[in-house]
């Protein structure tokens, strides 16, 4: 069957139940009427558009150990893929470096998204079956408390030049490493989710919504109850070959948080960073 990703009104009385249901069934949910200021999102996008078009972006090359800073075009590949993704991006942490041209609005958005994510984690915790919630080493909301690795990734997918490696796309099929991803609407279409029939489905780009998906760490902590669903970003049609910008917030537990008998959050993160070429 195809995925039935629910669109949920953040303010509805049964929003928590519907959100958990959608995440359980599909690994994704769409939230409307959320508390994030739409003008703020647009202003942050504009600041980063200016950053990526400047030569000074190279003054902030990423730190391989800390993983903050600027990751140039063709740096990252999906797990199991040899082709590099057609994107450049910047990693924002609470403690990390920020470009001089970027004002305080980015960090304000970071904190607003983190607050929403904390609420969403409490919704999952509340509605998880007892046999699932008892698997969590600590409550989900507590996993990210004072985490140093909650990451806002600002992504720029440049227009295609026509000289790209064969079969390379903006973001190859992958699953997210982290616990939960909160994604404000991208500036252009392109995000797709793989359904149970191995068909790719477009995800909404409604600028008044945020898209949520569960990652590998939630999948592991719940013993596969919450799926980490495969998704990708496809290349644009020739008539819409323009830049695309995206801002996912990746919620990461603290390093010492136990996911299952084989992994802590820290050990799994390091393993995956090596697999995708960032270590």
Whereabouts are the PLM-identified features?
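Peripheral, non-catalytic segments flanking oxidoreductase cores
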Residues: 1-279
């Amino acid at each position: 069957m195809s995925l039935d990703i629910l669109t949920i009104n953040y303010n509805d009385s049964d929003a928590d139940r519907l959100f958990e249901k959608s995440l359980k069934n599909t690994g994704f949910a769409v939230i409307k009427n959320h508390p994030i200021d739409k003008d703020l999102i647009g202003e942050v996008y504009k600041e980063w558009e200016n950053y990526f078009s400047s030569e000074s972006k190279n003054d902030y090359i990423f730190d391989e150990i800390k993983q903050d800073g600027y990751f140039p075009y063709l740096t990252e590949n999906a797990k199991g893929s040899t082709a590099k993704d057609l994107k450049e991006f910047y990693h924002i942490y609470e403690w990390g470096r920020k470009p001089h041209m970027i004002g305080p609005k980015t960090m304000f958005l970071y904190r607003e998204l983190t607050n929403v994510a904390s609420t969403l984690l409490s919704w999952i915790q509340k509605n998880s079956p007892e046999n699932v919630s008892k698997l969590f080493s600590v409550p989900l909301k507590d996993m990210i408390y004072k985490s140093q690795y909650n990451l806002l990734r600002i992504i720029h997918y440049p227009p295609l030049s026509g000289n790209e490696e064969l079969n390379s796309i903006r973001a190859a099929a992958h699953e997210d490493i982290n616990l939960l991803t909160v994604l404000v609407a991208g500036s252009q279409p392109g995000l797709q989710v793989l359904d149970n029939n191995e068909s790719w489905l477009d995800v909404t780009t409604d600028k008044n919504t945020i898209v949520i998906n569960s990652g590998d760490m939630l999948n592991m902590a719940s013993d596969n109850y919450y799926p980490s669903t495969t998704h990708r970003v496809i290349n644009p049609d020739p008539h819409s070959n323009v830049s695309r910008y995206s801002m996912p917030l990746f919620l990461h537990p603290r390093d010492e948080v136990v996911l299952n008998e084989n992994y802590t959050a820290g050990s799994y993160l390091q393993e995956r960073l090596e697999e995708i070429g960032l270590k």
